Each structure stands twice: as structure tokens, then as C-alpha cells.
Amino acid sequence: MYGIEYTTILTILISIILLNYILKTITNTMDYIIFRFLLLIALISPFVRTQNYGMYLPITGSLDAVYTNSTSGEPFLTSTLCLYYPTEAKNEISDDEWENTLSQLFLTKGWPIGSVYFKDYNDINTFSVNPQLYCDYNVVLMRYDNTSELDASELADLILNEWLCNPMDISLYYYQQSSESNKWISMGTDCTVKVCPLNTQTLGIGCKTTDVNTFEIVASSEKLVITDVVNGVNHKINISINTCTIRNCNKLGPRENVAIIQVGGPNALDITADPTTVPQVQRIMRINWKKWWQVFYTVVDYINQVIQVMSKRSRSLDAAAFYYRI
């Protein structure tokens, strides 16, 4: 009888030990699986884009409004806007409080006081060489000048795109353009640019390297010249060095957070660099030119539409630059 009881107790103990071992084995296996699963999630999460179902509540000073779920916040609630204008606009308005007035008007379009900055420039040529663009979104007002239509389109090309430039010593060296993004930019009070293409023996093609009068004239008496020649061919260059400078530049890509508003003029300027593409006229606004107050009122009215086709502090090489006319 006692032998049967001891056997029963021993069987129960063995069962408990075996069950405990099975449970520990299952626990260790689950820990291993969960650890590997979490590790996999941690590794792939930076490469996965998913919908954010959180609530985005921008701080505007008051939260007594209903906000809908969105993955992208309203740009004018969280961003800064710089408006660049010619000094003549400020002189014509002649009102010490005009910027404050415009700030109040921008407030009606959703731009908080202090988020819009007004900056004037004396000369658009100087401004375009190295534009100081400080804000998330930058809008440049450029007055149309019928005496320099070509210069205006090239100025827009400088402002709307980012360039990397180096000085050129045309008295010592030949130069060639390596790609369609490689241009020679000349600027000064009077720029006349002449070029002589060279063959592989550095002899002039249709010109004499020793006689600048035989060079081809690509620009005459202009303030700004963006010279585009045949790629991969050496050129001897001649410019009026006393009144003009020249630089070898590469276009890095568009400044997507910059737009230009052309003020006045009968036609919108086309700044398309590639003649095989459709002209960039689909993003142009136009109104009749009257006075600078009228210009600024129109800018306030349309500013949010302009912002929607720009990118905040971005410089993607795949997107187009933007040019507007009012």
C-alpha cells in the first residue's frame, strides 16, 4: 500500500517538473520570437512611410477651433515668409506704417503677426548674384523693364535656381561647357561676349584665335549674360573686362522655396532653359500694373495659392522652379 502511495507522489512530482520544463521552454521560445520580431520592426521602420493618425494641433494662441486629422500641417500656421521688393515701392508708398498694415492684411489670410518679413533691395542685378533668402518661403517682386526683357528672364533664372560658380581667367585658358547645366555667367555695366570654338588642334572653327574681330558675338552691351555654347568643345572667350566679369557656373537645381512675381509688362517672361520643353507659363499670375499698393494687395490675396506650389526649404533636383507674373 505504501509503495503505491510513493509511486503516485513520485509520478505527480515528475509531472510537475516536466510541466515546469515545458513552460520554461515555451517562454524562452516566445521570448526569442518576440525579440526577433521587434528587432525586425526596428530595422525596417526608418524605411517605411505610413499614415499618421495622430492629431496635429498647431499653436496659434488659441485652440477654440476644431482641427481635422491630417499628416501635413497648414504651412502658413507654422512657417515664415519673406517678401522682397524694390526700394522704389517703399518710396512710392511713403508711409511709415505700411509694413504693419500689410502684416494685418496677411493675418486675415492665416499668417500670424511676426511671420511675414519685408526686405527691400536697391538693384535686382546685385540681388540676383547672391540672394539672401532667409525664410521658409521667399517671394521676390521684380518690376518689369521693357528695356531689358532678356536680362529679366536671366535674372529670374539666377534667383530661382542655385548655382555653383568659379572665376574664369580667359586670358590664359580655354574653356568648355561639360553639360546643359554648365553655363558662363557674365555681369557688369556693359557686357559684350565673343567666343571662338576650337577644334582638337586648338585652331579656331570659323574664326582666328589671334583676331577677336573674327569671334562670334553671343551678347552685345548687356548687363547680364548667361552664355550657352556647344558642350564638349573648347572655346576662346573675349569680354570687355573693364566693364564686365565672367564666371563658370553649374546649375545645382531649383530653389523650390522661392517664387518670383513679375510686376507689369505686356507679356509673361519665359525662363525655360531647354528649347525642347513646353515654356514655363502655366504657373504665371497676371494683373494690370497700377500702383505698388495695388501690387501688394494682390500679393496678399493670392499668397496662399503661391505657397501651395512651393516647397518649404527644399531643393529637390527633380522639381520645377516657379515663376509668376502679376
UniProtKB/Swiss-Prot annotation:
Disulfide bonds: C82-C135, C165-C249, C191-C244, C196-C207
Gene Ontology terms: cellular component: host cell endoplasmic reticulum lumen; T=13 icosahedral viral capsid; viral outer capsid
Residue segments, region GPR motif: 253-255
Residue ranges of the region described as CNP motif: 165-167
Keyword match Protease: no
Additional notes on this entry: Some rotavirus strains are neuraminidase-sensitive and require sialic acid to attach to the cell surface. Some rotavirus strains are integrin-dependent. Some rotavirus strains depend on ganglioside for their entry into the host cell. Hsp70 also seems to be involved in the entry of some strains.
GO molecular function term, any single one: metal ion binding
Main location: virion
Compartment list: Virion; Host endoplasmic reticulum lumen
Segment forming the signal sequence: 1-50
Task of the protein: Calcium-binding protein that interacts with rotavirus cell receptors once the initial attachment by VP4 has been achieved. Rotavirus attachment and entry into the host cell probably involves multiple sequential contacts between the outer capsid proteins VP4 and VP7, and the cell receptors. Following entry into the host cell, low intracellular or intravesicular Ca(2+) concentration probably causes the calcium-stabilized VP7 trimers to dissociate from the virion. This step is probably necessary for the membrane-disrupting entry step and the release of VP4, which is locked onto the virion by VP7.
UniProt binding sites for Ca(2+) 2: Q177, D228, V229, D301
Binding site for Ca(2+) 1: D95, G206, T214, E216
Transmembrane segments: none
Residues with glycosylation annotation: N69, N146, N238
Posttranslational mods: N-glycosylated. The N-terminus is blocked possibly by pyroglutamic acid.
Entry keyword set: Calcium, Capsid protein, Disulfide bond, Glycoprotein, Host endoplasmic reticulum, Host-virus interaction, Metal-binding, Outer capsid protein, Signal, T=13 icosahedral capsid protein, Virion
Protein name from the UniProt record: Outer capsid glycoprotein VP7
Family note: Belongs to the rotavirus VP7 family.
Subunit structure: Homotrimer; disulfide-linked. 2 Ca(2+) ions bound at each subunit interface in the trimer hold the trimer together. Interacts with the intermediate capsid protein VP6. Interacts with the outer capsid protein VP5*.
UniProt-listed InterPro entries: VP7, VP7_1, VP7_2
